[in-house]
Amino acid sequence: MIKGVVNKIFGTKNDREIKRYQKRVAKINALEPKYEKLTDEELKKAFNELRQKVKSGQMSMDEALEDSFAITREASKRVLGMRHYDVQLIGGMVLHEGKIAEMKTGEGKTLVATLAVALNAMTDEGVHVVTVNDYLAKRDATEMGKLYEFLGYSTGCITSEIQDDQERKKQYQCDITYGTNNEFGFDYLRDNMKYSLDEIVQRGHNFAIVDEVDSILIDEARTPLIISGPTNRKLDNYVKADQIAKQLEKDKHFTVDEKDRVILLTQEGIAKAEELFGVENLYSLENAILAHHLDQALKANYLFQKDVDYVVRDGEVIIVDEFTGRLSEGRRFSEGLHQALEAKEGVPIQEESQTLADITFQNYFRLYKKLAGMTGTAQTEATEFSEIYGLEVISIPTNRPVIRKDLDDLIFKTEKEKFDAVVKKIKELHQKGQPVLVGTTSIEKNELLHKLLKKEKIPHAVLNAKHHEKEAEIIAQAGRKGAVTVATNMAGRGVDIKIDDEVRELGGLFILGTERHESRRIDNQLRGRAGRQGDPGASQFFLSLEDNLLRIFGGDRIKNIMNRLGIEEGEHIESKMVTRAVEKAQKRVENMHFESRKHILEYDDVANEQRKTIYKFRQELLNPEYDIASKIRENRAEVVEELLSQSEIFPETPKDDFNLEKLSKVIQEELGTKIGVEEMKDKEYDELKNFLIERLEKEYEEKMGQLEEEQRREIERILYLQVLDNAWREHLYQMDILKTGIGLRGYNQKDPLVEYKKESFNLFMELVNRIKKEAIKTLHLIELRNEQEEEEIRRLEEELAKMEAQIAQEAVMQHGEEVKTEPVITKKKPARNEPCPCGSGKKYKHCCGKSGPKKGILAAANG
């Protein structure tokens, strides 16, 4: 209440920010006459002079903002025939400051982005504009590219159609690059699998503007991007697990928690599964794979629905994106879930894959020095944007007031009654000539409504993942008189639905929602399709107690209200109280998802630090100037120490107790070098260690000395990279296993997150030691051919080319299964003067707190 009074007197923080921006808008408007007078050539020259000042550091971007915005607006008037409104100038400033601009549908977000893009591209470090699909990326790059070209910029566009790396690289070299979140993310992962700097396509992460930022940074945050390849761990138990899952009875053998999407076997279920598998203990170590298969088979059969979560087409299971309703072709669920769905549907089961590289959108977008976003709906998730990405949400006023009427929800007892009422309402609107856009939450419901409308002979267009090719065209026509469009929640974001004067007279576009989504934001997006730029319009949701949201999260309370009111079949209730109860249920789901995403990030942050360390070292290895010789010397000394301890020889061991026979054998087995016991006799620990290091180095130098310096360095780098990549892939597999089983630690009164951090750190240290040891072993065992010094390099390069081609051919880009994790535990960041958690022994402020790991691990690479 006090907050409300304060806001009335002083205005909200958002109001104060808007006032601050309005002062600068006045200054930009004051510059308009000055730039209007200039010829095209003079205008281009003025912008180029401004750009050079920013590029050379004579002027900051913020100092150049007013002139840059004024010139960009003038150029837009001339090239595109569009003048930026004052509210669009505010939007541009919000984006430039690295915030999220919440702008209603039809307020011209695409044009707003040009202001911040043109200003931020002045540093020549590249600007990425991220959209939700290839169609929008191509459309915006083509349309806005004309404006950028006038200003002297080059514009590129990355789509899934561009397969050639050099062509992709060319697009990234442009001043401004448009593309989808998937393409940017996968290019980053692929770049970190390359064996030459020339093949890397991206050129850093300077500034990104994310269009439909809520969809990309929130809806898709729970599904990681994964590049996977075939694994030799081929398993053929999917069909068996599917047969068993189908024989188990719900509630008797297992319980289903739809709220958390979890299935748990009962004691009776475990006994039945053990009997059917023919094993004594389903949860013993040797049967862990069977238990995992059964878990995935149960999920596939009882949590995943055909035509809702996936479709079957041409003998393939294709994922339906739950947020956009589009088919995610080429993507596969991970951890054997996709194979379980294939077994369920009786289609050919494709080989299980192994993760080669993965990252979440949360961690990919946090790579950018500056990040900004635009959307029509962000305030409901303002807390999440702030906590996870450090992004503030600013609501931009509309250019014209919104006059759309948002009517109260109508609630029916059954789904059948609801759809009968929906068809009746559509018929009524169609006869009147008022266009209606009907929103459904799944393909299944979409097609059900399609059949009902067909039966009533109501002409209509259908838009879902199965008919998405003409998406933009269908949506653009949805505002015509008498048009009826039935769409899943993909609903053509980014495409305006325009109406004419006749339709305005009829009341504008009518939005009819057939079910509430789990997120209020997606409902608001649907409402926002109507009433753009001050147009009339209306929106209303028709619900039933059988809808998923009400059934799982809040049906009982509403059911009681309906029973008390004595609602008969076919009747509905329409009340503010019920609408509030529905919103309460949505808030509960949103909070649950927020906690889940936050928790996933805590887990992924552990893997992310490891990923950054490995990728940083990989980048160093790719640099031809990298001092690989020092790295090999350093690793050799560490490997010698390990071989000594392997032979039970330690600094405190008396020299007479040294097991030199074992040491001699270990050195020959591991490094292929024969050193006799006599040569090592009568030496103290340090003397013996130094003798071995020198002897191994001498032999290695004699062998590699045959090569020219450049050839030698190339062989060493390539071999080191191969060892690193193989070890990293194996590590990712181990991490997957760890993540799958870590939740069980909670039953042992242990915090799963703390345990995960501990175990993953141990795995990472093992990885680091394995890389060092394997690299030294490989380099010492390599045999050079005498005929021609270049032969070895040629052989390695051919092998490498084959390997890369194989990875490219076999790798599958996919979204992982939505990750489910344990309850949230807050992670405390170390204080500046505390010891660094990486184990370097330094204070946090002098180590990782400064600029990433410095010591030990792989960071000693420059030694």
UniProtKB/Swiss-Prot annotation:
Keywords: ATP-binding, Cell inner membrane, Cell membrane, Cytoplasm, Membrane, Metal-binding, Nucleotide-binding, Protein transport, Translocase, Translocation, Transport, Zinc. Disulfide bonds: none annotated. GO terms for biological process: intracellular protein transmembrane transport; protein import; protein targeting; protein transport by the Sec complex. It is found in: Cell inner membrane; Cytoplasm. ATP binds at residues 88, 106-110, 496. One of its GO terms (molecular function) is ATP binding. This is Protein translocase subunit SecA. May bind 1 zinc ion per subunit. InterPro entries: Helicase_ATP-bd, Helicase_C-like, P-loop_NTPase, SEC_C_motif, SecA, SecA_DEAD, SecA_motor_DEAD, SecA_preprotein_X-link_dom. Part of the Sec protein translocase complex. Interacts with the SecYEG preprotein conducting channel. Has a central role in coupling the hydrolysis of ATP to the transfer of proteins into and across the cell membrane, serving as an ATP-driven molecular motor driving the stepwise translocation of polypeptide chains across the membrane. It is a peripheral membrane protein. It comes from Nitratiruptor sp. (strain SB155-2).
